[in-house]
UniProtKB/Swiss-Prot annotation:
Bilayer-spanning residue ranges: none
Self-association and partners: Homodimer.
Gene that specifies this protein: purA
Binding site for Mg(2+): 13, 40
Protein name stated in the entry: Adenylosuccinate synthetase
Organism: Anaeromyxobacter sp. (strain K)
Organism domain of life: Bacteria
One MF term in the entry's GO annotations: adenylosuccinate synthase activity
Length: 432
């Protein structure tokens, strides 16, 4: 079977966790390759809801291996908490089911303090960070002064690095008008204990995955956030601190580009965004509030209400291009049931001209207004439907129009929250 990358094709929160959970049955290994616990995957299986922030969604499938790659930044407190919660639910019965990279960087208390202090200092220019220390941790990684999982396994090395890095953090926080209250010896003992808790899962992930491929195992790479939040290709600076696009899947786990055979982009049937930044199709009216309520658009990590709007075909086409998408899975199609008309942005109006591609400058995007194409809505409930032909004609027409505008096939539609409430037209693991 091929190896498949799943990435968000919008601004995150597209429902990647559900699709990964569905596709895991066809894979042997699920790999997380970037981001941290600023991402939240909400899974509903048999009516039971599980929210994961670090461990890949596939962990709910017995017999599947889940990998956290070197490109992920890990809050060890969160990782241990998720392990304990999963075990309490009867999942993760085999410790060999979870593999954690020794080279993944660690989120420390000062990263969170710096994250919050900076956001407060920015005033109206806030980016909308979750305050979980993701950005400062990636900064330390690039500056070559970060701590990695392997550092937690050597208490003497950990103590030395904590002393050095905490001093730098105090200086930065002082400049921001904040303080770092830290008992360094206690912190070292706590993080050494966390290191012992995760030591049984920690290994060289590159070697582990290479051997899995040699054994003929298939991989499912699970992205976090979305294309429009990529640090290089998103609406900078209103982005996350890592590369969220498909090209980073192999970089974030120690494999080469030939390991990827298929790239699946996940897009809602409408759109949402959390935090600041340009969002041309945003609806600040009753329709936007209706989408928010029907779609349950509140962050799995922060609980913040998401900004909502109609589907943006320009943004989706951009995601197709920068990820090299092979296909799209459309989620929350059921949320659009009951709307008299549904709209798709097919262009942007700017200074009297109509653009058919998304500008690369976010300040220019801010000045754009959407040009909409309207399609008739449908009233039929979709949750019980399981095949493409079962969908109401108007719902099928909507999906087909999105497919035409995006330039790639819509290979699946989610029609409800539960894993089983999905119509799979083409299985990426069986595609030729």
């Amino acid at each position: 079977m091929p190896n498949v990358v799943v990435v968000g094709a919008q601004w995150g929160d597209e429902g990647k966790g559900k699709i990964v959970d569905l596709l895991t049955q066809y894979a042997d290994v699920v790999v997380r390759f970037q981001g941290g616990n600023n991402a939240g995957h909400t899974l509903v299986v048999g009516g039971e809801k599980t929210v994961l922030h670090l461990i890949p969604s596939g962990i709910l499938h017995p017999g599947k291996s889940c990998v956290i790659g070197n490109g992920v930044v890990i809050d060890p407190e969160v990782l241990v908490l998720e392990i304990d919660r999963l075990k309490a639910k009867g999942a993760l019965k085999d410790d060999g089911q979870l593999v954690v990279s020794l080279d993944a960087h660690v989120i420390m208390p000062w990263h969170k303090a710096i994250d919050v202090a900076r956001e407060q200092a920015m005033g109206e220019g806030k980016i909308g960070t979750t305050g979980r220390g993701i950005g400062p941790t990636y900064e330390d990684k690039v500056a070559r002064r970060g701590l990695r999982i392997r550092d937690l396994l050597d208490e003497a090395r950990l103590a030395r690095k904590v002393k050095e890095r905490a001093a730098l953090a105090r200086e930065e926080l002082a400049r921001l008008g904040a303080k770092l209250e830290l008992d360094e010896p206690a912190l070292v003992k706590r993080y050494a204990e966390l290191g012992r808790r995760v030591s049984g899962y920690a290994t060289d992930v590159s070697i582990w995955l290479h051997r899995a491929l040699q054994q003929g195992k298939s991989l499912l790479f699970e992205g976090a956030q979305g294309t429009m939040l990529d640090v290089d290709h998103g609406t900078y600076p209103f982005v996350t601190s890592s590369n969220t696009v498909a090209g980073n899947a192999v970089v974030g786990c120690g494999l080469g580009p030939t390991a990827v055979d298929y790239v699946l982009g996940i897009s809602k049937a409408y759109s949402t965004r959390v935090g600041g930044g340009p969002y041309p199709t945003e609806l600040k009216d009753e329709t936007g509030e209706r989408l928010r309520k029907l779609g349950g658009e509140y962050g799995a990590t922060t609980g913040r209400p998401r900004r909502t709007g109609w589907l943006d075909a320009l943004a989706l086409r951009y995601a197709v291009r920068v990820n090299g998408l092979s296909g799209i899975a459309m989620t929350k199609l059921d949320v659009l049931t009951g709307f008299d008309t549904v709209k798709i942005a097919v262009g942007y109006r700017l200074d009297g001209k109509v653009l058919d591609e998304m500008p690369s400058d976010p300040e220019v995007i801010e000045r754009c207004t959407p040009v909409y194409e309207e399609l008739p809505g449908w009233t039929e409930k979709l949750e019980h439907l399981r095949t493409w032909d079962d969908l109401p004609p108007r719902a099928r027409a909507y999906v087909k129009r999105v497919e035409e505008l995006a330039g790639v096939k819509v290979v699946g539609c989610s029609v409800g929250a539960d894993r089983g409430e999905t119509i799979l037209v083409e299985n990426p693991f069986l595609a030729r």
